């Protein structure tokens, strides 16, 4: 059935809709658009670093491109797609709910995001741009940027943060209050668990960021001195406040991908539940809890005392335990399955392998003595891109491969989707693996020129980014081709216990008109 057959009411249907499926679709479209813009900025970065010398006119412009790339990818690509897109579409279906708890608030949450995106793009193009990186540290963001660019970036972060807080409250209330009475907490799917913990982290950490950037705004415009040491302030306070948000944000980005991969392993194997399902739930909760108390591992170089560094090193290493539980549970779930050619299997295995590799470099960086040496080098850049570019983004591709036919009623071309995986797998590895070695040799972040000794690693990385971009274009073609070829889903052979598949028609406005009861004997995950 055509997904858009019911959308005959023109633009007003999209602007005013309070239906969770319509809003989820809007989030997907917005996330795809933002991802393309963010990828364009990343390509500019790699073109600048492709060889020694200058491609962009100056370092301020280069740092503005870095800021735009980071904020676009984090706040406008990964979060809207993972939480807004997959969360809106699937959470009510998996809970047996007719819609989200606050449908109009859901609509507001989405429309705050395009506003926020316009503000951050404005910030990059006025007054020489916002060259502060996404961290917006003072005094670079105060005395170093006297123009209006940082003010626009702060308002952008406020709008995006408000969107996420309102959406988070909505998801929490939906999970608590609209869950079918037949679904107890232990019977919720792992995707619902990951979204629930994610939005809890959002509601906990985003007000802290809002406070920090509001103080920064008053420092810039109202002559306060929260972060100005010459008048009794302390810029270190800003770092603590920012990273109290910034580190949970990393888990906000990756946790929904964990849920998607868990659902994908069930789909691939046909098993009733993931291996160690209760252990997986506790691992999700542990990651969320520990992620809130390790923020200062981003700040080893600020001069913390030995006891603080010892604590934050140890606590950071502890996160590897629940993460390891999840990885081995996925592998144990996949164990014994019939190996058939399936692009979904490629994405799942690619995610597990590459996320694990990124996690290993994270264990290296958790050691404060090593991190002081490697801080602000490309080793750190490679680490968090392995976790995000090859973790969260591969999670998004996994989710699209898994649920595309469920959401749209059309089938993706398996061969071309496998080609997308191969291009992206080769491209992102070629981009970020060599940069580990550049970082170990001391190549610093946020510099637009470098000595010739680093040129080999950077040339390889730039070729990799071109391959990745080609993979993205092919992915967009695959999505369009599935519509144009009109390959409809005839029936889904999936006979597992995941609740969303009990829907006979995927495009009704409200899926459940009355309360639905699931059999808890079959609904084990």
Swiss-Prot record:
Top-level taxon of origin: Eukaryota
Q: Where does Ca(2+) bind?
A: 48, 53
Binding residues for Mg(2+): 375-376
Q: Where does Cu cation bind?
A: 247, 297-298
Claim: ATP-binding is one of the keywords in the record: no
**Membrane topology (UniProt):** Multi-pass membrane protein
Q: Does the keyword Transmembrane apply?
A: yes
Provide the binding site for O2. 251
GO annotation, biological process: aerobic respiration; mitochondrial electron transport, cytochrome c to oxygen; respiratory electron transport chain
Q: Which cofactor does it need?
A: heme; Cu cation
Q: Please give the Gene Ontology molecular function terms for this protein.
A: cytochrome-c oxidase activity; heme binding; metal ion binding
Q: Where is this cross-link: 1'-histidyl-3'-tyrosine (His-Tyr)?
A: 247-251
Instruction: Tell me which residues bind Fe(II)-heme a.
Output: 69, 385
What does the annotation give as the result of altering residue 466 to M? In strain: AB1, AB2, CB4852, CB4853, CB4855, CB4857, CB4858, KR314 and PB306
The record's EC number reads 7.1.1.9
Q: Which reaction does it catalyse?
A: 4 Fe(II)-[cytochrome c] + O2 + 8 H(+)(in) = 4 Fe(III)-[cytochrome c] + 2 H2O + 4 H(+)(out)
Which residues participate in heme a3 binding?
Answer: 383
Q: Which UniProt keywords apply?
A: Calcium, Copper, Electron transport, Heme, Iron, Magnesium, Membrane, Metal-binding, Mitochondrion, Mitochondrion inner membrane, Respiratory chain, Translocase, Transmembrane, Transmembrane helix, Transport
Compartments (UniProt record): Mitochondrion inner membrane
Tell me how the cofactor is bound. Binds 2 heme A groups non-covalently per subunit.
Q: How does it associate, per the subunit comment?
A: Component of the cytochrome c oxidase (complex IV, CIV), a multisubunit enzyme composed of a catalytic core of 3 subunits and several supernumerary subunits. The complex exists as a monomer or a dimer and forms supercomplexes (SCs) in the inner mitochondrial membrane with ubiquinol-cytochrome c oxidoreductase (cytochrome b-c1 complex, complex III, CIII).
Family designation: Belongs to the heme-copper respiratory oxidase family.
Protein purpose: Component of the cytochrome c oxidase, the last enzyme in the mitochondrial electron transport chain which drives oxidative phosphorylation. The respiratory chain contains 3 multisubunit complexes succinate dehydrogenase (complex II, CII), ubiquinol-cytochrome c oxidoreductase (cytochrome b-c1 complex, complex III, CIII) and cytochrome c oxidase (complex IV, CIV), that cooperate to transfer electrons derived from NADH and succinate to molecular oxygen, creating an electrochemical gradient over the inner membrane that drives transmembrane transport and the ATP synthase.
The protein, known as: Cytochrome c oxidase subunit 1
């Amino acid at each position: 059935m055509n997904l858009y057959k019911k959308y005959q009411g023109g633009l007003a249907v999209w602007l005013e809709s309070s239906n969770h499926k319509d809003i989820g679709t809007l989030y997907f479209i917005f996330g795809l658009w933002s991802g393309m813009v963010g990828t364009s900025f990343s390509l500019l970065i790699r073109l600048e670093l492709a060889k020694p010398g200058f491609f962009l006119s100056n370092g301020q412009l280069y740092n503005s491109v870095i800021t735009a790339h980071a904020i676009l990818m984090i706040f406008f690509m990964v979060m809207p797609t993972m939480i807004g897109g997959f969360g809106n579409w699937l959470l009510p279906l998996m809970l047996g709910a007719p819609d989200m708890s606050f449908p109009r608030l859901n609509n507001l949450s989405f429309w705050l995001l395009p506003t926020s995106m316009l503000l951050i793009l404005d910030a990059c193009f006025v007054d020489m741009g916002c060259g502060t990186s996404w961290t917006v540290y003072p005094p670079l963001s105060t005395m170093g940027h006297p123009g209006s660019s940082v003010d626009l970036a702060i308002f952008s972060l406020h709008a995006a943060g408000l969107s996420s807080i309102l959406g988070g409250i909505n998801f929490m209330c939906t999970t608590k209050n609209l869950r079918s009475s037949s679904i107890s907490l232990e019977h919720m799917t792992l995707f619902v668990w990951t979204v629930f913990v994610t939005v809890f982290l959002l509601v906990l950490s985003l007000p802290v960021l809002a406070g920090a950037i509001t103080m920064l705004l008053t420092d810039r415009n109202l002559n306060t001195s929260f972060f100005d040491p010459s008048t009794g302030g302390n810029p270190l306070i800003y770092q603590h406040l920012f990273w109290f948000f910034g580190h949970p944000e990393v888990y906000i980005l990756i946790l929904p991908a964990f849920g998607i991969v868990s659902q994908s392993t069930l789909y691939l194997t046909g098993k009733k539940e993931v291996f160690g399902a209760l252990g997986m739930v506790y691992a999700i909760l542990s990651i969320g809890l520990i992620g809130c108390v390790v923020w200062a591992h981003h700040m080893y170089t600020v001069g913390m005392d030995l006891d603080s560094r010892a604590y934050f090193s140890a606590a950071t290493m502890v996160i590897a335990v629940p993460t390891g539980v999840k990885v081995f549970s996925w592998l144990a779930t996949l164990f014994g399955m019939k190996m058939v050619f399936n692009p979904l299997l490629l994405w799942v295995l690619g995610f597990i392998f590459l996320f694990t590799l990124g996690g290993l470099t994270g264990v290296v960086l958790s050691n404060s003595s090593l991190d002081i040496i490697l801080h602000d080098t490309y080793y750190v850049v490679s680490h968090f891109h392995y976790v995000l570019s090859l973790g969260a983004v591969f999670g998004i591709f996994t989710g699209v491969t898994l649920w595309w036919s469920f959401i749209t009623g059309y089938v993706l071309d398996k061969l071309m989707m496998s080609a997308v995986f191969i291009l992206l797998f080769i491209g992102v590895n070629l981009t970020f693996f060599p940069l580990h070695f550049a970082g170990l040799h001391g190549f610093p972040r946020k510099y637009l020129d470098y000595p010739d000794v680093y040129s080999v690693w950077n040339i390889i990385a730039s070729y990799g980014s071109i391959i990745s971009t080609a993979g993205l274009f092919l992915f967009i073609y695959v999505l369009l081709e599935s519509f144009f070829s009109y390959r409809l889903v005839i029936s889904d052979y999936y006979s597992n216990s995941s609740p969303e598949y009990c829907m006979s028609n995927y495009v009704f406005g409200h899926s459940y008109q009355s309360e639905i009861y699931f059999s808890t004997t079959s609904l084990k995950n």
